[in-house]
Amino acid sequence: VISAGLTALALSATACGGGSKGVTVQGAKLVQKGALTTCTHLPYPPFQSEQGGKVVGFDVDVIDLVAKKLGVTQKIIDTPFETIKTGSALNAGKCDVAAAGMTIKPDRAKFIDFSQPYFNATQALMAKKGLGVTSLDDVKAKKLKLGSQASTTGEDYVHGKGLDSTSFKDSGSELNGLRSGQADVIVADYPVVQGWLKDPANAKFELAASLNTGEQYGFAVRKGNNPKLIQLINQVIDESKKDGAYKAIYEKWIGPMPAGG
């Protein structure tokens, strides 16, 4: 397991930050000596979730490679997604890097510096079996209750298509909303839906449709403040794709890697 022994979870979003003196390692600025501090938003499997007291997932394993390159240990801070995409968590010195299955968007790039894309993503609809849903048009025509995660590109996408949705604070709440009947259909990132459907507890649900939104995920650092860290992250992404580490992480958390991926 790539992340074994490398990742520690800080249960409070205020566990590190402005109070500690920053250090520089290989030109990269770090808020805490001996650690690469990562802001994320839990739970968001398969990219990050807590299992057995540890945070694990796709993003965790990739950032562990960055921490290893720096000779430090990754430390994870759970913080609201809103504070990640607006850059406020990074600006407050709570973390060095944001890794949260976050889509690269121009409006977000005004506040944070993105790495190169590390994951090609899209959206999906998950619904109870038998509803006959194959598109957003079906959701609208059948007047079904649609659920989405707050402040996400999935929510933005369905709203842009003229649909209203019940907004849930995180992906776990969104899934529970579907299970409890608060929503008939939910929109979420495709790999997240794939992960949910592997759980026998979700056997009565199905992948109703994929929505090709052309999204790509990126990691992020404080705007205009840490170019060496972004450079190092990009280097690790490139190297991991060449040496097979990225493929191993992909197959571990997502499944078979697409050709050319």
Identify the function of each model-found stretch.
Residues S12-A15:
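C-terminal motif of bacterial Sec signal peptides marking the signal peptidase cleavage site
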Residues G17-G19:
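Bacterial signal peptide processing site
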Residues L42, F119-A127, Y190, Q194, ...:
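Periplasmic-binding protein-like
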Residues L42-P45, V55-K69, A121-S173, Y190-Q194, ...:
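Bilobed "Venus flytrap"/periplasmic-binding protein-like clamshell domains
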Residues K75-D138:
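Acidic, polar ligand-binding/catalytic clefts
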